[in-house]
Amino acid sequence: DRICTGITSSNSPHVVKTATQGEVNVTGVIPLTTTPTKSHFANLKGTKTRGKLCPKCLNCTDLDVALGRPKCMGTIPSAKASILHEVKPVTSGCFPIMHDRTKIRQLPNLLRGYEHIRLSTHNVINAETAPGGPYKVGTSGSCPNVTNGNGFFATMAWAVPKNDNNKTATNPLTVEVPYICTEGEDQITVWGFHSDNEIQMVKLYGDSKPQKFTSSANGVTTHYVSQIGGFPNQAEDGGLPQSGRIVVDYMVQKSGKTGTITYQRGILLPQKVWCASGRSKVIKGSLPLIGQADCLHEKYGGLNKSKPYYTGEHAKAIGNCPIWVKTPLKLANGTKYRPPAKLLKER
């Protein structure tokens, strides 16, 4: 008898590309890549995920919440990850806002980037006694409060001269905006100004000329000049038609730093401020969040990691995610394929 050593031969459908030998047939491979299919977005496993800024604020946009619309006040949950579900943030209800004049649509996105967000319990400025006053705090029937009375945004006070004695034109006035957050957070201070047609400007403020406004905080200074008139009547969210408009902006104050606002008539003075800390990873997505996933991917939604790599569309992803590669990867777990040996005839 004879004992012959060798390797098992079989047909091999597996081809791998190697660095030194090019394409090589092997007896077995393990796929390392997957191509995901689009799915709904989900909560990220092992961490808190935020969809809407205020999940319990019904019929409210994130901009409503960020501005403190009277019927949109609530707790913003802490989260390590946030879904940017309003890619082009919609307008706020309440009072018509000139969104194209400022960066105010970025405010909800700014807040989403923080892990912890809370609204101050106290006002940052006493609006009634601010320079140029005394003032009464204006309200609007287009901005109903929880009892359906006239209201306004919680983050701002509409400073209307209280009597005819101070209902006159004024030179620029300056008010300091103190830092009032208590835990070293970033303070996001919302402010703005109101303008209308000449008749309404004289009626409210005693001056029909364009007004000047400037904010300064954390090394950033912004200037505005109000537009007088030329606005068509506009109703927001079923409210009363308004001939006026408001311009709204914000400034970020670091711990212990004071900001300033210089203004004339029509100022919307800051009131309650946002105190925000920590970082939340933000990714574009959609709501609702259904179930849990290892990874959130802008193009594919919620993914559960089954392979270390993926092919397909490359986009931002957060969580325990596979790594994008251009072409599929395989790991050879067999031997190099050799064709069946021919039997030799005995002599």
Curated annotation (Swiss-Prot):
- Stored Gene3D superfamilies: 3.90.209.20, Hemagglutinin Chain A, Domain 2
Domain of life of the native organism: Viruses
| PTM notes | In natural infection, inactive HA is matured into HA1 and HA2 outside the cell by one or more trypsin-like, arginine-specific endoprotease secreted by the bronchial epithelial cells. One identified protease that may be involved in this process is secreted in lungs by club cells.
Name any Gene Ontology BP term.
virion attachment to host cell
Q: Which GO terms describe its molecular function?
A: host cell surface receptor binding
Q: What else is known?
A: Major glycoprotein, comprises over 80% of the envelope proteins present in virus particle. The extent of infection into host organism is determined by HA. Influenza viruses bud from the apical surface of polarized epithelial cells (e.g. bronchial epithelial cells) into lumen of lungs and are therefore usually pneumotropic. The reason is that HA is cleaved by tryptase clara which is restricted to lungs. However, HAs of H5 and H7 pantropic avian viruses subtypes can be cleaved by furin and subtilisin-type enzymes, allowing the virus to grow in other organs than lungs.
Its protein name is: Hemagglutinin
Q: Which organism is it from?
A: Influenza B virus (strain B/Nagasaki/1/1987)
Q: What gene does the UniProt entry assign to this protein? A: HA
